[in-house]
Amino acid sequence: MAFDSRRGVVVMYGGSAGDSVTWEFDGIAWRPRAFAAGPGPRTGAVMGYDSTRGVTVLFGGARSGSPLQDTWEWNGVLWIRVTTPTAPPPRQRAAMAFDAGRGRIVLVGGEAASGKLGDTWEYYAGAWHQVVAASGPPARSAHTLAYDRTRSRVLLFGGAGTAGDLGDTWTYDGAAWSQVAAAHAPAARQGASMAFEGGRGKTILFGGQSGSTKRDDIWAFDGSDWVELYPGEPPVARSGAALAYDGRRGAVMLFGGAGTAGPLADTWMFR
């Protein structure tokens, strides 16, 4: 899920149901968008809104269990498949964010047919470029990524590593990854959801899954430490929810996810 700041709508595509419907939320209602062709059914894809070019970028996911590596752009009217000279290997359950300071989509990790991935890629000028860094987050999938506009850093948290759930925090400045030694942090988990909240100038994290336990906790990261928030009754515990910051309405938007009894289809605003 991503927020299209030019048109003032939240954009969502696909999901655990494996459908191929594009939905937009204008602050009042979700509306399906009709189009002639598009990315097709998939789960585990990632999306990010490129505010420099005014398009929502979608990459990968899986169809019938097979990871994908296609790149698509949604301009509000049509989905356009982008053919690039190179591309990240096929994957699902990766993480993506748009680095507004540098005008680049950042893609990290995910799960290929061969296992977890730990690579970093950037998408700009119609092409994918792999980032070769001295060190970085270990391989993982089902992690979460957001761009901190206040500190001009991409923030990564948690995920499913090769040996279990992770609870580490990393930042990326476009040149190198740095692990954050926070005094406090959410419990290790996969499938959490994260978005940078412009009003507070902090990154908000919600839910996820630790082992077999779904979570409903809410945390805020200020660039150096995590603080748990208690905003009244939160959405029910879940993992894999779609989350995006709606800058027009000043609210973090949440949709769906996997609850303790199955898939969810509820919509929440956090202000």
Residue map of PLM features:
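Kelch-like beta-propeller repeat domains
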Residues: 1-271
